[in-house]
Amino acid sequence: MFGQGRLGQAMALLLFLGMTAALARGCLQCDPNFAEKFSFYRHHVNLKSWWVGDIPVSGMLLSDWIQNTMKELHLAIPAEITRKKLYQVAEAVYQRMDQLYQGKMYFPGYFPNELRAIFREQVRLIQNAIIESRIDCQRHCGIYQYETISCSNCTDSHVICFGYYCKSSAQWESAVQGLLKYINTWHKQDEKMRTTPAFLSQNIKCLEPQHLVNLTLEKVSECLTQH
């Protein structure tokens, strides 16, 4: 397919987990059932272990769940997740937590260790959900947008990408024309107001800001097919 080489490179970039923690609160708190569920978990934590030392440790794990989630995500892309995937992750977490809370008191150390295991699994699910959506987006042909929730403030957001999965030269040409039109419109926007899509990447030299003014259809197509 046209542009598949570039798609592969983009997928590899998306799978890279950067080590700079995003300035956000988390993702799971954006689920409408989160407050009720975690309020229950916190208020019943003192009934889950025979050892009194487990109670403050478990309580801290639950209280810091959201902020610790963002510290562990380490994503090199913005933490924006689709509602469908968010609800799927939340349901998986609640299911494991509910099962844990259905048991009677546990022997010392077991309960906080199980909480840590659920936490790690939640982080992995969120990482995969965000990255998979980005990869799926790039499997389209041309400019594509999908709706998300921003994990930083739980507001509606969207992700815009450029897909390289074009099945013919005509589709590819149309995709490049759409990209050029988008770039021209983007370039005219107020720098303080606009956001920079991931595909306007420094890894693609011709799409760096200083080159956008002089872009032509031929230059864009040539540049993209070289990556």
UniProtKB/Swiss-Prot annotation:
Q: Where is the signal peptide?
A: 1-24
The places in or outside the cell where this protein is found are: Secreted
Ordered alphabetically, the record's keywords are: Glycoprotein, Secreted, Signal
What cellular component terms from Gene Ontology apply here? Answer: extracellular region
* Glycosylated position list: 153, 214
Principal localisation: secreted
Which InterPro entries does this entry report, sorted A to Z? IZUMO, Izumo_fusion
Under the heading Pfam families, the entry gives:
IZUMO (PF15005)
* Further comment: Izumo is the name of a Japanese shrine to marriage.
State the family it belongs to: Belongs to the Izumo family.
Protein name per its UniProtKB record:
Izumo sperm-egg fusion protein 4
Which species is listed as the source?
Mus musculus
Taxonomy-wise, where does this protein's organism fall, top ranks first?
Eukaryota, Metazoa, Chordata, Craniata, Vertebrata
